[in-house]
Amino acid sequence: MKCRSCNTKLKPFFSLARMPLVNAFLKKADLKHEKKYELATAFCPKCFLVQLTKTIPPEELFTDYLYFSSTSASFLAHCEATADVLIKRLRLGKESLVLEIASNDGAQLQCFDKVGIPILGVDPAKNIARLANSRGIPTIPEFFTHAFAIHLKEHERVT
């Protein structure tokens, strides 16, 4: 295994063996078909980056994602505080555009929207993007790739 950042040989240090995806609430009959993935970490002795040793294909993680940001009161309070700081520090206003990658159900974006700052969310989970859109938070259900960034620059007034 090589470091994702500097390509140095990694040193594994912790493993939980094979684990199912989080928040996958299965019926008893489906448990025997549940996919499990290696969940282990490694340390890079050169750049000190701690990283997972295996990456789950994003399409498997986000097909039907079940975590919704807006269900946590403490996270919503954090979103408000973060928005207040960013609005002041960056002098955001009606001519700005706040683009959030992995925007989930739009909990953070709604803090900017309610004060009239234009927003756009990008989240690969189609079910969550659909919910965000139904709440008036414009959200594109896509993975944020280089090609998609170019598309945004050409079509969504993102510079």
Feature map (PLM): residue ranges:
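Conserved alpha-helix/loop element of class I SAM-dependent methyltransferases that forms part
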Residues: 77-95
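Conserved class I S-adenosyl-L-methionine
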Residues: 94-104
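Conserved SAM-binding loop of SAM-dependent methyltransferases across substrates and taxa
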Residues: 105-117
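Conserved SAM/SAH-binding beta-strand->alpha-helix loop
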Residues: 125-127
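Conserved SAM-binding strand-loop segment of SAM-dependent methyltransferases
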Residues: 136-149
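A short acidic, Gly/Pro-enriched loop at the edge of an enzyme's catalytic core
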Residues: 150-159
